[in-house]
Amino acid sequence: MFAVFWTNLRCLGYNTFTCGVETPTTWGKVGSLDASSSTFTTYRGYPLAMAISAGTPACDSPDDNIRRAINTLRADLSALLRGESVAYSAFLSACTKFDGFAQSCHGMLSDDTLDLLYSFSESLLALSENMALLETKKEAESNKFTAEVMAILSDKTSGLDLSDDKNEPTSPTPAYVEPCARWLKDNWYNPYPSGEVRTQIARQTRTSRKDIDAWFIDARRRIGWNEVRRKHFENKRVDIVRAASIFTGPQSIPAEVDALPDHIELEFAGILSRARSLYEEKFSPSKLAVKLDTAVKDMTPSLKEQLKNDEARRKREASTVGIINQRARHAYPTPERSPASAAELLASPPSFAIDSDKLPSVGRKRRRSLESDETVSSPLCKRPRSQSVFCELSPVKGLPSPSPSTQDELLETSAAPSPQPSLLPKLTPTDSARSTGKRKRRLSDGFQYPAAKRPEIRPQVVSDPFPATSSEHWEQWFREHVLSSPELTLTGDIPPAVTTDAPDSNTPLDIQLFNFPLIPDLPPSVPVVPAPTAELNIIEPLEVPAVTQVNVDPEATALDHTFSWMASDFPPPLQSTNTFPSSSPFSALDGMSLPFPDTRSSAFLPDPSLWSNISDPDLDFSTVFSQPSTNSAMTSSIQVPLQPTWLTSRSLSEQEREAKRKELEELEARAQAIRAEISAP
């Protein structure tokens, strides 16, 4: 009875009773069995058998031992089924020994003990059979479940991409373009891919077959294949493919086949070029990419480590150099050289000393402020770097203000106006330093000119962009352009004040006129006569005929006070071309102090049209001017003052000229009326 149970129990194995239980290596032995003897010792503290060989009864009867063993095994089996910590191997070994012990003492057991033993064995048998069946079905269902899950996963994950699309850059061109363009570049002579090729490209790029077919149709058109096929091969696919194959491999052409014409070869060369550019323009790596790829491939781990060490070493060297330069920059300055000897003091300063006359005025003030700051500061303090650099640039420490005597001379020179410029004495650095009274202490002359550490000819930035002109240049320019002029006679003395006396009406006038050109834009019909102003400040010369004379009352025509200065023997007038009249009033003072134009010009001759309506007897002015009347064509011109030329230099517009002409006509009419009144008896 127990044999079937133990056999089924062994067939179930470890997994039947140990699901979720610790491994057997961690279990301790629940019972112990002495293998050297056939006597069971204990199982969980209970004796299992007695010595059979001697037949001596044990301490307890076999019934008691069997009952206690069955109870213990039933409890351990329940614990084993619940997954508690029970040693499966120890339980199985105990059951085997218990089976042998029960068979050995079968005849000594009572009926109650046998009934208990049979019931326990039946329950174990049913349990073992069900457990064995369960294990078989479990294994079958597990295998079936695994197969179904793998089938589902393989079906659902076939279209999935395990790569992270978010990290990959999205390309503007579809994925199928690159393999199609690569195939077309390699097979341009027969751009008709088979169905297998197009299906493979569609499967690799997860694209529909329709898109692949459409791309190849458009590509043949773009490379010019269709045009050449229609133009030279009567739209026959076989002929153009054969000709393209001949163009691709001329060495494989049979002898009886003629070579392709030149224009056909030229067409195929264009197709080949366009097919290659279709791929290389977008997908072929550039020269820089190839070079970088080669450099990355050649970059071994040891080379990377070496480059990293070199970079760290360069950084350390750069930091060290920076620290050294900083320390040198803040170091205490070197002492200046010792005082020079007497011979060096008497010698001229070196060539790099800056002349005080060459420096701009703004620069002098700035350098003097730097010097004053340096002298006030304590000698124990370090000199600022800006001042030390300035000392290297210029050996002259500063240019102080001129001495009081020089300032007095300047004040006197500026107060007294003189045509000649005042020459200022040049101030040397030594004299200027001696003239200052603010400096407390000064180094010797040997310290004034340290060795120049920079080039002598070096541009310096100053506040005044225009350098000051020296007095020598100004004096030379004054001598060349002013003193050398023959019109000027400068004596160097201050001229006396100019006084103007009241004019004497009895004093004859000496009038000289400038030679200005005539107005070229006057029409020939208009007489060239200066237009008198509204105040009649210009009196035209009257041409008096000497043929007829009219007796005029001396009292009515007495011009003693006005024309007493007009003598008969006038000097010959000068020739003048001034014809610029002016409308401004003319005073007697201006006529006496300013030169006037020549009255011999045609501008001072009367208009003949004004005398056409007057008879000859009416125009005899011999009695007025106390001159004999003659029949000759000689005329007597009266010299009258005109306006100065600087008042008539402005050109007139057309409106102004028209107004002047109208004004001139009115004045001429008025003058004609006055002449008629004068000539009346």
From Swiss-Prot:
GO molecular function: DNA binding
GO CC annotation: nucleus
An example Gene Ontology biological process: regulation of DNA-templated transcription
Cellular localization per UniProt: Nucleus
Biased composition (Basic and acidic residues): 307-318
Keyword field: DNA-binding, Homeobox, Nucleus, Transcription, Transcription regulation
Low complexity: bias regions: 413-430
DNA-binding region: 165-227
Annotated InterPro entries: HD, Homeodomain-like_sf, Homeodomain1_C, KN_HD, Mating-type_A-alpha/beta_1_N
Region span, Disordered: 307-341, 353-381, 394-466
Function: Has a major regulatory role in sexual and asexual development. It may bind DNA itself or it may have a role in preventing DNA-binding of another protein.
Family affiliation: Belongs to the TALE/M-ATYP homeobox family.
Domain text: The C-terminal domain has a high percentage of Ser, Pro and Thr residues.
Oligomeric and partner information: May dimerize.
Protein name from the UniProt record: Mating-type protein beta1-1
Biological source species: Coprinopsis cinerea
